[in-house]
């Protein structure tokens, strides 16, 4: 099975069903005749930008829209505790276990001023393309990550 077909099926499942984890997603793919290894699914989810977000009823795997929607932005905002910076980088503190999802969301914003992110358990390090852009990146994050 080609990667494109697998990606399309993953998107279809995540847009039409509530899926709480990758194991559940593997089972749903198997029901559709797609056998996939955990490592392959993990790579697919990363490539598709799948986020694991907290909802009122627990966790859910979600695919962000090409233009990040307000629903995902709202979920990300609930996970952020603080955004701080120094002369060279920006640090985002999140709820425990939520840094990866926040980092993925930032990566999918595809801001040319952001070189990349590194996520731990509850901290995201945002590395700007240039240290001269720290202020504008902070402003951008306030606008795109928080609903103030």
Curated annotation (Swiss-Prot):
Task of the protein: Regulates arginine biosynthesis genes.
Q: Which gene encodes it?
A: argR
Q: In which pathway does it act?
A: Amino-acid biosynthesis; L-arginine biosynthesis [regulation]
Q: Which Gene3D superfamilies does the record associate with it?
A: 3.30.1360.40, Winged helix-like DNA-binding domain superfamily/Winged helix DNA-binding domain (1.10.10.10)
Q: Which cellular compartments is it found in?
A: Cytoplasm
Pfam families registered for this protein in UniProt: Arg_repressor, Arg_repressor_C
Name the family the entry cites. Belongs to the ArgR family.
User: What keywords were assigned to this record?
Assistant: Amino-acid biosynthesis, Arginine biosynthesis, Cytoplasm, DNA-binding, Repressor, Transcription, Transcription regulation
UniProt-listed InterPro entries: Arg_repress (IPR001669), Arg_repress_C (IPR020899), Arg_repress_C_sf (IPR036251), Arg_repress_DNA-bd (IPR020900), WH-like_DNA-bd_sf (IPR036388), WH_DNA-bd_sf (IPR036390)
Organism, by scientific name, is Chlorobium phaeobacteroides (strain BS1)
**Which parts of the chain span the membrane according to its record?**
none
Give the protein's recorded name: Arginine repressor
